[in-house]
From Swiss-Prot:
PANTHER family: INOSITOL-TETRAKISPHOSPHATE 1-KINASE, INOSITOL-TETRAKISPHOSPHATE 1-KINASE 2. This is Inositol-tetrakisphosphate 1-kinase 2. Mg(2+) 2 binds at D285, N287. Keywords: ATP-binding, Kinase, Magnesium, Metal-binding, Nucleotide-binding, Stress response, Transferase. One of its GO terms (biological process) is response to water deprivation. It catalyses: 1D-myo-inositol 1,3,4-trisphosphate + ATP = 1D-myo-inositol 1,3,4,5-tetrakisphosphate + ADP + H(+); 1D-myo-inositol 1,3,4-trisphosphate + ATP = 1D-myo-inositol 1,3,4,6-tetrakisphosphate + ADP + H(+); 1D-myo-inositol 3,4,5,6-tetrakisphosphate + ATP = 1D-myo-inositol 1,3,4,5,6-pentakisphosphate + ADP + H(+); 1D-myo-inositol 3,4,6-trisphosphate + ATP = 1D-myo-inositol 1,3,4,6-tetrakisphosphate + ADP + H(+). Residues 108-314 form the ATP-grasp domain. Belongs to the ITPK1 family. InterPro entries: ATP-grasp, Inositol_tetrakis-P_1-kinase, InsP(3)kin_ATP-grasp, ITPK1_N. It comes from Glycine max.
């Protein structure tokens, strides 16, 4: 394709998102920036046939109903040149907190001054009768632990995380959970945003460190939203602004490795640095189609990604 053809080419990118996601992601600044760079972002009505709303060079989406998946499959079979970001069956892997981290354990890359892994964790289907001490002997998993609903599908309950300090707190839980070891990490989480080949890492405030003295008096469990009431968040000491960023080589390799292993383009990775071993990094969560608008200059970040996709398909 000649440069003159590329210069005159416009691309239609359809988006199918829930109302809140439209408000946060499809901001006027993104629409304008994309439009200035030959991309027209078009809202898709998921209740109407896609055939009547096209043509599309690319479709981005974050809807999980079976009806939507069927619509997408039917449209894709008739329009194989339309790029679907991303295939629903691959996105589904991130809806389970065990399968989402499986990909990390199979990554094949070596870093000179750092290691990457996942925290120890176990699935608990019946929290009321679970005995963590057995797993303490076998796997070294001990209190405190972070309890996360097994389902990470974006539903109301999937974000209800809590810190569990003992058996009493564990038995008070109800839904199937993943218990993940709590690792002191200086109160900072590194969020690696991925959009295809585009990668951006930012640091954010996280749960603070918990001292051995504090552990002696903590009982039961506490939702993340109330952890600050314990004074725990200030135990770690290091402020977010003072935290050193992970090596760029780690950020780039982790993004590339997960993009290939998951087969996905739009996701972010939550990474912490072990407070006891500063070269040990742990992936604690992977989210599909995260809040990109929180990134500085997210408009060119997303627009450049979309251009990468549509131009590679039409080249």
């Amino acid at each position: 394709m000649s440069e003159s053809e590329v210069a005159g080419q416009r691309y239609r990118v359809g988006y199918a998102l829930q109302g809140k996601k439209v408000e946060s992601f499809i901001q006027p600044s993104l629409l304008d920036h994309a439009k200035q760079h030959s991309i027209d972002l078009v809202q898709i009505d998921p209740t109407a046939p896609l055939q009547q709303q096209g043509p599309f060079h690319c479709i981005i989406h974050k809807l999980h109903t079976q009806h939507w998946k069927n619509l997408l499959q039917q449209f894709s079979s008739k329009h194989p040149n339309t790029v679907i970001i991303d295939p629903p069956e691959l996105v589904d892997r991130l809806h389970n907190r065990v399968s989402m981290l499986d990909a990390v354990t199979h990554l094949q890359f070596s870093l000179e001054n750092a290691t990457i892994g996942v925290p120890k964790q176990v699935v608990v289907n019946e929290p009321k009768s679970f005995d963590l001490h057995k797993f303490e002997e076998e796997q070294g998993l001990r209190f405190p632990v972070i309890a996360k609903p097994l389902a990470a599908d974006g539903g109301a309950g999937s974000h209800e995380l809590c810190l569990v300090f003992d058996e009493e707190g564990l038995h008070a839980l109800s839904v199937p959970m993943v218990l993940q070891e709590f690792v002191n990490h200086g109160g900072v989480v590194f969020k690696i945003y991925v959009a295809g080949q585009r990668v951006n890492c930012v640091k954010r405030k996280s749960l603070g460190d918990i001292t051995e003295e504090k552990l002696k008096v903590l009982r039961g469990s506490l939702p993340f939203s109330r952890v600050s009431s314990l004074g725990v968040e200030d135990e770690g000491g290091g402020a977010v602004e003072d935290a050193e960023m992970p090596p760029q080589s780690l950020v780039g390799e982790l993004a590339r490795g997960l993009r290939e292993a998951l087969g996905l383009n739009l996701f972010n990775v939550d990474v912490i640095r072990d407070g006891k071993e500063p070269t040990r990094y742990l992936v604690i969560d992977i989210n599909y189609f995260p809040g990109y608008a929180k990134l500085p200059s997210y408009e060119p970040f997303i627009t450049d990604f979309l251009l990468d996709i549509v131009r590679s398909k039409t080249a």
